């Protein structure tokens, strides 16, 4: 696959996209578009929550908020 076709396939937007990242410790990080990332149920609200508004074609805006981390809860961590 050429570099141009790789970039073209990446730049196609999907409104219901969801990204997830698993670490070696078994905890996971899951984030959908315009959502708050959760670091897993074993470490609720540890560190800053990542508020992400992602537009793959244009840019990635990340803002870190320590205040949001204190009150942010993951949907799976009840």
Curated annotation (Swiss-Prot):
PANTHER family: HSSA/B-LIKE PROTEIN 1-RELATED-RELATED, HSSA_B-LIKE PROTEIN 1-RELATED. It holds the Pfam family Coiled. Residues 1-31 are annotated as: Disordered. GO terms for biological process: sorocarp development. Disulfide bonds: none annotated. InterPro entries: HssA/B-like_chaperone (IPR050533), HssA/B-related (IPR008455). It comes from the Eukaryota. Belongs to the hssA/B family. This is HssA/B-like protein 29. It comes from Dictyostelium discoideum (Social amoeba).
């Amino acid at each position: 696959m050429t570099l141009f076709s790789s970039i073209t396939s990446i730049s196609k937007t999907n409104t219901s996209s969801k990204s997830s990242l698993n670490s070696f410790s078994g905890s996971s990080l899951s984030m959908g578009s315009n959502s708050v990332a959760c670091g897993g149920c074993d470490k609720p609200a540890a560190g800053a929550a990542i508020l992400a508004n992602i537009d793959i074609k244009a840019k990635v805006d990340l803002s870190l908020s320590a205040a949001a981390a204190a009150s942010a809860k993951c949907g799976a961590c009840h």
